[in-house]
Amino acid sequence: MLDYDGTLAPFRVDRSKARPYTGVREVLARIQESGRTRIVVISGRPAREISPLLRGFPPVLRDPVEVWGLHGAERLYTDGRHEVEQVSPATQRKLDEVREYLRHSNLGGEIEDKPNAVVMHWRGASPRIARFIEQRARELFEPLVKLDGLMLLEFESGLELRVGRDKGGAVDTVIGEVPQGTPVAFLGDDLTDEAAFASVNRWSGPHLSILMRAEPRPTSAMLWMRPPSGLRGFLKRWKKVFGGKAVRVASAA
């Protein structure tokens, strides 16, 4: 299982330009072509944003991959089936009100539209502006966390007010779907991936949780690797070791 932004691809202020690190598509394509590994991306983005970025054009990866979007609230299967958790009308109205307020507040930063969340990004802003945006966003979001089903999700250079979901639920579902004893790995970089690491660690089996980022930080992940060399090396090793066995890999973003 793999996260996308910050794990498979470097962060970009313009998220539409966040393409995988050099060589990553090619090694994922070889893993996919072996027919022995299920590749799953688990991202905070809407699921349909991931496949075009990951596969490239023309596609390097022959087939679609399974994508869990919105931190696990959305699932896009390889055959095109799509499931998304519904938000109650009352909660949706509140999120719409907050989103509309932010659009007219001139805070700076960037508002990301998600059906189940309001997201404020300040990546690329100066430290002074970033602190200002974060403070104002917290002042707006934190009182609303008390509402039923809403939670505040912190990540690098952003805050997300969302319906209560995290990547751990997606990881639990994926692991629960594969035969006992199947090797599973989750690779992620951000604070939003900690729930996924914790879920992997709770399951008994030959599983790995890996923090993939330039510098180490406190984490529940079992291992730390530095991208992009650590990422490419891990994926190549996975292909070499498990190329002839039926295995499952899941990915986050």
Predicted regions and their residues:
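Short loop/turn segments at strand-loop or loop-helix junctions that form parts
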Residues: L2-T7, L70-A73, P115-N116, H121-R123, ...
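Short glycine-/acidic-enriched loop or helix-start segments at secondary-structure transitions
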Residues: F11-R12, I50-L53, A196-F197, A221
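Conserved acidic, metal-coordinating active-site core of Asp-based
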Residues: S105, E112-L187, L191-H207
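Mg2+-dependent phosphoryl-transfer enzymes with acidic/Ser/Thr/Gly-rich catalytic loops
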Residues: G168-A253
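Active-site phosphate-binding/coordination module
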Residues: R19-K114
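Conserved Rossmann-like nucleotide-cofactor binding loop
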Residues: T7, A47, T192
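A short acidic, often aromatic-flanked loop/helix-cap motif at beta-alpha or helix-coil junctions
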Residues: A73-L76, V118-V119, G158-R162, R217-P218, ...
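Asp-based phosphoryl-transfer active-site loop
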Residues: M1-D14, V41
